[in-house]
A protein has these predicted regions:
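Structural and coupling elements of P-loop NTPases
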Residues: 1-598
């Protein structure tokens, strides 16, 4: 056990975590240069296309150190985006140490701080690593100063590397072996293993990712999940060496996988403890706090025939994405579907893309919302995350919406535009402080609903990419909210309903009506699109009807003949309008999202 090192790489987005993982894998000779490809641990197409890590990935490396001993290194590459913090915290629970990666030109950013606090919470040994030292804009002395002042770490221990060029990788491996502690655990105690992730294999069932805390396990042994007492027999165990590599067993301190023919997807829960049936441990491992969803949206299959496939796909995706929460939902306009909770808008996009790509299901996604707390006239409280469930306003005493504390780190020359952006989003300026002579941390309290759509994108464009943003949830606060309904041909479409602040309601209604007009195809009759609060219409757009030229066969002659044909056409259209149902395409629901992004 003394030769095992379990560690994660944590950093802000784009500071080079996956590239550093690539170099460590190459330096230890796990993959030959011929078979190597960049971002080797990012095995989803969507990760490669976007150039981001979404899933934490584990890899087992063998390293022969300068002292002549061979060490087992278990590396977990983590995501950097604020939406995937839950992935990071789960990875850290399986480690004793962390490499805190900092870009030599960008310096310490918001997620650097957030990830440092996470690592400190888990009592990890932290090694600061300054990456991208090959860049012309690299300022190593400035970053060392930030490590001392902003992070409170010893900058003398910082390792200088260029993951792209491969500089300093051997020195880093030596520091990992010397500085990081080996895992603690009792090899002779009853088996206690923490599930920190899992994924589904169509041939082998659920593959469980485990960190062995105490004891040992080997194939053919009977195991039990402590949260639900489900029992299975181990078929295979081993390490992740990019692909699965089976081993005759796993020992205390090791990180690996087990396959036990688990076909019931719901039996495997992240944070659960595995023990042996014949000799169980007394107490489970302290797991993870449940991920709290921040953004809610409904997902419906475009074709109702795909509903059963969607149920199956969500179950399997939940295995691999523990922060996804969902429950059954139905809509008069869209049929049966699911109300899902996500950690942010990027998380929503990724889930949508994975469902469509990996499971081949065409989806309709409704506009994302947050959860609101309603205090009714009788004093009772109700929490809703779906605008369609908003009760009659006369029953509501007041409404509360969630607020966040946002930490925004920017160069001070962008202070004015960022302040303006936050004020436009109903922000409250709480504090600001200079981190260095020209870098500023601004603290704002903002309504979550104003942030979930495009706040981060706007911040990045205002600050030309130099702004970074992190947030934590605060409380619910009183707010003047109204339910905005949309009517198409005087029929309410529940899936288009939104809860908005009264001051923004009219502008939002106009924009949405305009977008709907652009995306609903022209019909044989006139279509009215209305935005309304209660019974009061506050915005309207009209889609004109197709008009067939019924007078084409009249050559000259009396005008009354033409008039008669036109009147006849009008009557036919009137009748058609009464029975005509307007088909609302997927594009119209997406249009509501687009409105938010403008």
């Amino acid at each position: 056990m003394k030769n095992i090192r379990n560690f994660s790489i944590i950093a802000h987005i784009d500071h080079g975590k996956s590239t550093l993982s690539d170099r460590l894998i190459q330096a230890t000779g796990l993959v030959s240069d011929r078979n190597f490809q960049d971002q080797i641990l990012d095995n989803m197409d969507i990760e490669r296309e976007r150039g981001i890590t979404i899933k934490s990935q584990t890899v087992h490396l063998s390293y022969k150190a300068e002292d002549g001993q061979t060490y087992s290194l278990n590396l977990i590459d983590t995501p950097g985006h604020v939406d995937f913090t839950y992935e990071v915290s789960r990875a850290l629970a399986s480690c004793e140490g962390a490499l805190l990666l900092i870009d030599a030109s960008q310096g310490v950013e918001a997620q650097t701080l957030a990830n440092l606090y996470l690592a400190v919470e888990h009592n990890l040994e932290i090694i600061p690593v300054i990456n991208k030292i090959d860049l012309p804009s690299a300022d190593i002395e400035r970053v060392k100063k930030q490590i001392e002042e902003d992070l409170g770490l010893d900058s003398e221990t910082a390792v200088l590397v260029s993951a792209k060029e491969g500089t300093g990788i051997d020195a880093l491996l030596e520091v990992i072996v010397q500085k990081l502690p080996s895992p603690e655990g009792d090899l002779n105690a009853p088996l206690k293993a923490l599930i920190f992730d899992s994924h589904y294999d169509p041939f082998r069932g659920t593959i469980v990712h485990v960190r062995i805390i105490d004891g040992k396990l080997k194939p053919k042994e009977k195991i039990r999940f402590m949260s639900n007492n489900a029992a299975y027999s181990i078929e295979e165990s081993g390490f992740f060496e990019i692909e699965r590599a089976s081993r005759p067993g796993l020992l205390a301190g090791e990180v690996g996988y087990i396959i036990a023919g688990i076909k019931t997807v719901s039996d495997t829960k992240c944070g659960d403890t595995i023990t042996l049936t014949r000799n169980p441990c007394e107490k489970p491992v302290t797991g993870f706090t449940e991920a709290k969803p921040v953004v809610f949206s409904s997902i419906y299959p475009v074709s109702s025939d795909e509903y059963v496939d969607l149920v199956d796909a969500l179950e399997k995706l939940k295995l691999n994405d523990a922060s996804l929460i969902y429950e059954k939902d139905s809509s008069a306009a869209l049929g049966f579907g699911f109300r899902c909770g996500f950690l942010g808008l990027l998380h929503l996009e990724v889930v949508q893309e994975r469902l469509e790509r990996e499971y081949g299901i065409s989806l309709i996604i409704t506009a994302p919302t947050v959860s609101y707390r309603l205090v009714l006239n009788d004093g009772s409280k109700k929490i809703i995350d779906n605008p369609a469930l908003y009760p009659d306003p006369t029953m509501i005493d007041y409404t509360e919406e969630p607020y966040i504390k946002a930490s925004i780190i920017i160069p001070d020359r962008y202070m004015g535009p960022v302040m303006k952006l936050c004020m436009e989003r109903r922000g409250i300026n709480k504090n600001y402080q200079y981190l260095t002579s020209n870098r500023l941390e601004m603290i704002f309290e903002l309504p979550l609903a104003e942030v979930i759509f495009d706040f981060y994108d706007k911040l990045k464009s205002i600050t030309q990419g130099y702004g970074s943003f992190d947030y934590e949830m605060l409380d619910h606060r009183k707010s003047d909210l109204v339910k905005l309904d949309f009517l198409i041909n005087f029929d309410r479409v529940d899936a288009l309903a939104q809860l908005v602040h009264r001051d923004n309601a009219e502008a939002r209604a106009r924009k949405t009506c305009e977008k709907l007009r652009e995306s609903i195809p022209t019909q044989m009759f006139k279509i009215a699109i209305q935005g309304a609060i209660g019974g009061k219409v506050i915005a309207r757009k009209t889609i004109s009807a197709f008009r067939k030229d019924v007078t084409a066969k009249c050559y000259g002659g009396d005008i009354s003949r033409k008039r008669k044909l036109l009147e006849k056409q009008k009557k036919g259209k009137k009748r058609m309008k009464m029975v005509g149902q307007v088909m609302v395409p997927q594009a119209a629901f997406l249009a509501v999202l687009k409105t938010e992004n403008e």
